[in-house]
């Protein structure tokens, strides 16, 4: 493959053996595509906003004389861009405008005659928009809507696993789940009667449902049973014989015909007997009367006496000898009996009809009405209306396309299309299928199969929520349409947008699936957007989810990651999308496979869902292929119907596209994943998401090859949109001169990229972009121009490469503790910047408005030294706990003054006492620097001096920004003009002496060139007009007042930056789940060092490896040592052999990229000498290698790289103790491991309390750092002090240090006076106990007399 100039700067050596069949899909497409489908105008009207409108409109009035029709919708432009929304704390959204048509029909004319039509565009609230990175900005914070995994609509058959009834009998059930509407359940009881439930209410016999659908008993029996015909002739009863029905039965009488006995009485009828009967063509059998008496035969039809017209026997009655005699008397010569048996044709429906109390449709409807609406008197219309609305009304019930497809496939109806409501046949098919399963024909469904669970993405959930809003509006509109006078009414008067925007706002703001984005680092952002949750509205709940739902299912293969899931109560309920997975049009997850034809894998890739995959045989990606491209083993491990098996190449239909297909993005970042235990890999993939971006990002030496892709897709880097040459670079912008072949007609050909500088993320880490390119460099589309947080030259870089040794060191690495060298801290390897935002709000109160000012009562000069005259802290001030950031005073109510205070007020004026100090102060344990201040003032409130200063600064910055942009474009235009003029024969030197503006006025003879010049003049005018317009918009935005919440006058936001160095107590981890806490930071000279005197950075405990079974970390250490070693060797070659020939460098570098079993993708013949030297210099810090999961470097390749670096093949070095200078007695495993600093910093957790707030009832200190609380001294701790006999210490703990109110106040005063005595009193808890006992009506009093 060809590398661009940028990519040639540093290339990762790939150890992957398998060829890449397909590129990894764009990682955020699940979010972006879903929302795009929702928001874009869809002319078919099947998805998105269009579908929501079509499902509600037209809304007709009750009388039908008028209706409101939907025509089309459009979204406006957002008022503020994403960054402005974040600063101002508003939602990034656009206004939704819908064109509606009000049609009024003429009452007097024939039906359908239109009297009047009025069209109007109506505002329907704001619709939040998705940013280009798949997030939403809601009230200024970035949020992500997590996709939900829920049970697909359709029909499901299941059983209770024998748990319901004490006998352990398995009871089968069927459940029809619509997309919206009532659930319909059918279930068997222990007596094998079939019952129906609607919406999980009280159960009714299932035949009530059939009667309500207008079936009679006779029709019901005809639908579910075959019949056997009996004839009566001359007093002899004969039955028509279908021989196959006798199989396995016991002969109750001699089975004989034509004088031949086939089966004797009491013998079992076998297949041989049946064959004999069929051979002799026996169609009827004479039956003795006793047979009828013994067998409970059930009549299939109603039989009516020909003489009297009375019913002799009803359908489903049991035939007795008396009834038989009556039938014979009334001249009926033949009758039908339903055919049932114990084995495969149970009498379930027949038995159910006997427990069914209803006999006609009306009774059935009333019974259903009573069950759904207990206590309401039923009327015929109400009962019919309710039943119709349950399953047969489109506005109340919708199976959806998915539901209909799943339903038809499960009950065997042809085709995937059909109505969204249920039909009679649908209900019958469900009952028939359920009875077939009970009869032993068919199997129940696996609810955890991914063919039965589907993904609901953002777009679909937003659409549902929007529909909810529209339904609320619909009722109001229908009322208003029916009120009568519509002569002057416009659509605008009918629609109230409040309920719609409220529903949308509620979803985006407070739904369980709308989550605060995890913005620790680029990986955590991407993973959060690819998360799939089974929780949320319409999903599972943590408490009710069992083991099966959480478990890994065979259908997860390539769809959901089996590794990445949280530890704790949510395990298995929150999953991550596998790398190549996507959703299909029905919302089921599908994964790509390579087609295999006649044992030869092709390059054709097909996506299969879990349902489709079941019928194919699929081989692993690791199946070996010979030089002819054929699968070359006799038996190949493959998967079929969820089981692993071995089959020959000819039987194989598909094979995996990649070994990383089964895992998620986070898991595929772990090198040597295949050597780690799954539990530790889970911790590894979860902890990478908690890594804090370091000050100087450092790409991993040992990676997996997906780092670059992740950094680009995450959106934290800046990617070139078009090819060109870098024209200008500074810290905040990059200007690219676009190549001519990518220019649009009439365009200046300049791309300007603005960088984000020192912004706060959701997790208070720092977002900052730094350019990676230099002026004059050629770039192509897709190149990385600037690194974001945790990226290094376009590679994801979550941590640092550290030199580690596995050895014990004086017990400082006991229990996973980590010992680090002072050098790590000095070099700022793990120093991170954290930005905190503090807001101070000045409100309007009953007593007057709060004021932000520097005039604060009872505060000394020193405390105000960092504030300006407006009472706001300066940018750049270094603040410590307790410092005032924003001075604010609040009016307080009038209090009764003492004479002394009155005197003081008379002398010193009013101010001091009628306001109280409510300033914003720095929190405890925060030492920081103020980096930014924002002031927001309500419209109509006068801005203070600081607000005006900030406004002026912003205006200057905006003007400078736009002016520079304009200048760049202007220069580009003048360059073009100069080229045209010189080309037309004008003298260049003369032109350069003229003012540039006059170039555009020069007239030339060549008409074509003159037209080009005219185009350029037009372009210049457009650019100038754009500049003026943009500056005007910017100015208006900056100077206008802010839209603040009611009652808020002013908001001041102060941003503080804290630099956190590595220190004992911080949590660190590798990528293999090997986590630990720093126990000590040791001087460099005391650390173990190698024979060249190079000390190690980190010492880890070797006992952390064997029991955890994450050997990947050891392999990573060895490979890291080799990668670093070859880099150092290259550096020595170039630096210390000044006159070294470039060919030797080229040879060595080429050898590095070519060795090993993997196909080589790097050919240095395509690189010029300068590019080779640039590449070599970028490899000084080590050769970055990629070892993809399940396809990585093997032991031989690691040994070979160690040899190339002139290092021992064992990967172990002889170390010397830095303190004693004595060598350790055996070689130690030393190497480079990629270590992360996790967002669990000791500074955020360490906390100590002196005195503070107390709980209101118990008067005990509060708990937790946020409340400045104390340490809990619990029951067991009390036992410990009792055991030691430390009586006074215990007394102190339970009284003055806790809830003895008087004692603690006195103690405090004593300590201030230097007197350290204590007098314990009565703990408040005792009083609480007394009160609680009294609340039980037991009078208890404390006798303190003696």
UniProtKB/Swiss-Prot annotation:
Gene Ontology molecular function terms on file: DNA binding; DNA-directed RNA polymerase activity; ribonucleoside binding
UniProt KW keywords: DNA-directed RNA polymerase, Nucleotidyltransferase, Transcription, Transferase
Gene Ontology biological process terms in this record: DNA-templated transcription
Keyword Transcription carried by entry: yes
Family (UniProt): Belongs to the RNA polymerase beta chain family.
Subunit structure: The RNAP catalytic core consists of 2 alpha, 1 beta, 1 beta' and 1 omega subunit. When a sigma factor is associated with the core the holoenzyme is formed, which can initiate transcription.
Functional note: DNA-dependent RNA polymerase catalyzes the transcription of DNA into RNA using the four ribonucleoside triphosphates as substrates.
Name assigned to this protein: DNA-directed RNA polymerase subunit beta
Natural source organism: Psychromonas ingrahamii (strain DSM 17664 / CCUG 51855 / 37)
Gene: rpoB
